[in-house]
Amino acid sequence: MDITVGIIGLGPMGGNIARILLSKSFSVAGFDVEAERMKPLGEVGMAMTQSTNEVADMADILITSLPNMTALEAAIAEIVKIQKTDQVIAETSTLALEDKLSIHQKLKAKSKIMLDCPISGTPSMLVGMTASIYASGDEEAYKKYLPVFEGFTATNYFVGKVGNGTKMKLLANYLVHVHTTAAAECMVMGQKAGLDPELIYKVLKPGAGGSKMFDIRGAMMAKSDYREGGGTMFAIYEK
């Protein structure tokens, strides 16, 4: 499929999406307000750009991966300046439902197509090709660019009208928080009972009480080291 994928936001999620697609011979152009994020990706073949406008002008499909609504609104304000009708924007950020619907309307008014496509998974899950994507919106646009979504996820699902992707992601997040909290309480309880945290992780991980979150975050808890896969909020905390 001869297409150019534009990625706006090259943090822990967007940067890994770019790297994975590049490894699978996709043509990728990217932009991030933090220029240092672009250099290592440029070294492996990504076209480094100077602005959101430049990426939008180059891309057949845009993927936005941004930390908050303020950043997304700034990007959309530039994207709508590019005169490409029916250009598809796959919005992968985790934001409030009303924010996603607002952006959808702004893009629709400029004859652009937004797919609400939040990702279920951590940066390390993206790297390991175990993340999922919940796509919602224009089904024909989703089908057209399905090879792109399949390029960086293990599973992807079309879940209906715009906003359904975010609804599904919020349900997934609810389960993530439940399992993460339970894993943390289990670790603390085990250590108070005199058990070694590394042993707790090793023994419980493959059993009936294990979970994907225990697999990923239990390892961090056992080592008391949360840097790997910590994501944007951990990077902000470290600063």
Stretch-by-stretch model annotation:
Residues T166, L175, K212-K239:
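Interdomain hinge/lid region at the active-site interface
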Residues M1-T64, D86-V88, P123:
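NAD(P)+-binding Rossmann beta1-loop-alpha1 motif at the extreme N-terminus of oxidoreductases
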Residues L195-A208:
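Small-residue-rich helix-loop
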Residues T52-I113:
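Rossmann-fold NAD(P) dinucleotide-binding segment
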Residues V28, M48, I113-L115, N156, ...:
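Hydrophobic beta-strand scaffold residues
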Residues V5, L10, L95-N173:
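Rossmann-fold dinucleotide-binding core
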